[in-house]
């Protein structure tokens, strides 16, 4: 099965960002992609770089016109879309990703682990996610999501693997020359859980902050299953064979050889 990561920048014009995303979905679908993922908070500029209450106006409800545009694109192109966005839900705000399956909202993941770092003031804007770690049953396979910092906490990906995920999308908004760190972390998660993990990173300049892209898909043997992207807008293609996942799981047996009775300290 062919999947794609849409590595793109996002500016202050939300409508333009939406239109660009929809356009790139069509191109990815023409290339044969059946599942298409986007970077973290892909519809907005990188507002968490500082604390600014006026930026809450950038949030969208799941029922908003912006999200509906991607629902329509999912129907038109008959694809599954993993769309990260700034979510407004009643009086709470989340760093979220909606999974759209050929026009159907398959579900929503809300980022669990929120950094509070220079240029990443996420705890000011977002409530920690309350969705736990769902696996979305779609027409193109079982999909999990771990948003940016979530991927540096291995428990989430392990839960997704235990619950039957075939693919984990890892949308990020990474800068500051951290590519080597992310390549190691994502590849290790893919290998330790014998599944596919697609890291889709943001690109572009945003108020002095540079996002470097370099998106890639790691496979269940710890290998690269896509070309490593550059630092410009791009569509990254990966061709997956689920037999590879099954073979890796059978060979290494990480999940079936676990010893949960010995892991009590991890939740203290």
Go through each PLM region and give its residues.
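Residue-level detector of high-confidence beta-strand sites
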Residues: 96, 108-110, 170, 227, ...
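Active-site catalytic loop in hydrolytic enzyme cores
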Residues: 60, 88-163, 175-184, 250-252, ...
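CN hydrolase (nitrilase-like) catalytic-core segments centered on the catalytic cysteine
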Residues: 59, 65-80, 152-235
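Extreme N-terminal starter segment of soluble prokaryotic enzymes
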Residues: 1-4
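Short beta-strand scaffold segments in enzyme catalytic cores
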Residues: 83-85, 96-99, 134, 199, ...
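Cys-nucleophile CN-hydrolase/nitrilase-fold catalytic domain and related Cys-dependent amidase chemistry
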Residues: 14, 23-102, 106-108, 175-188, ...
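A conserved C-terminal secondary-structure "cap"
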Residues: 243-268
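Short polar catalytic/cofactor-binding loops
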Residues: 7-14
């Amino acid at each position: 099965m062919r999947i794609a990561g849409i590595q793109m920048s996002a500016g202050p014009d939300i409508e333009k960002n939406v239109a660009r995303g929809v356009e790139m979905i069509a191109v990815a679908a023409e290339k044969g992609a059946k599942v298409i993922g986007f970077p973290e908070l892909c519809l907005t500029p990188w507002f968490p770089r500082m604390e600014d209450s006026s930026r809450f106006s950038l949030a969208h409800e799941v029922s908003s016109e912006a999200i509906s545009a991607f629902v329509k694109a999912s129907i038109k192109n008959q694809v599954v879309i993993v769309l990260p966005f700034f979510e407004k839900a009643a009086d709470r705000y989340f760093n979220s990703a909606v999974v759209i399956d050929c026009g159907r909202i398959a579900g929503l993941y809300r980022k669990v682990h929120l950094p509070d770092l220079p240029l990443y003031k996420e705890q000011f804007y977002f409530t920690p996610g309350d969705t736990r770690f769902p696996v979305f049953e779609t027409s193109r396979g079982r999909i999990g999501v771990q948003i940016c910092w979530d991927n540096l906490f291995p428990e989430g990906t392990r839960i997704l693997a235990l619950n039957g995920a075939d693919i984990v999308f890892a949308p990020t908004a990474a800068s500051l020359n951290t590519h080597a760190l992310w390549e190691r972390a994502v590849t290790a998660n893919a290998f330790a859980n014998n599944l596919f993990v697609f890291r889709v990173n943001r690109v572009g300049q945003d108020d002095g902050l540079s996002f470097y892209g370099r998106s890639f898909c790691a496979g269940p043997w710890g290998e690269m299953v896509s070309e490593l992207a550059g630092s410009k807008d791009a569509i990254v293609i990966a061709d997956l064979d689920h037999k590879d996942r099954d073979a890796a799981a059978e060979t290494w047996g990480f999940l079936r050889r676990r010893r949960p009775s010995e892991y009590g300290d991890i939740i203290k």
